Amino acid sequence: LGLSFPPFHLGFLAWFFLIPLFFIFNKSIKLSEKIIFFYIAGFTSYAIITHWVALNSGTSVQVAIISYLAICIFYSFYWVLFCLILHFFNKRKLSDKIQLLLIPFIWVLIENLRDIGPLAAPWLNFSLSQTGYNRLIQIVSIHEDLSLFFIVLLNILFYKFISLKQKKYIYSFISVILINALIGQILISNYNST
């Protein structure tokens, strides 16, 4: 996921970043092992996304490195929270349609929780990974959470396509991208005409 953020300009990677975690989550392994994988994924992502903190020239090297590590360690627990909530709902054997709506909603909720209070980190918002795609990022102007929702939905659809080998999921994946791009084009056209 970290590579999908600027300055790398690989925003499309955000559409797939959860897929390995979904495979791990659905394996027959202990919850504690799943938590470790989610934590490592979060830590790695934040280590890449916030690399600039360690390079902060406005402070000493020690403070910059400690701040950098603290960010990576602390915010990775939100990925653990996501894993725990998935585990809770996974025991309920929800339908595919409910999962398609609930899992993105959970991610959006967690990102919103992360952005509250003095430790808020809006620069970690996954919507920022789409800044290189003018048409796709426009949905943020309607509501920032829609972009997050669509990113997680794309991950779920592609995961379901790979794991279940049903074409309806890849068609849905492509449709979500096209609809998002169409909405973006309409918003850009409306902005340019005013």
Name what the model sees in each region.
Residues 1-194:
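Membrane-embedded alpha-helical bundles of multi-pass enzymes
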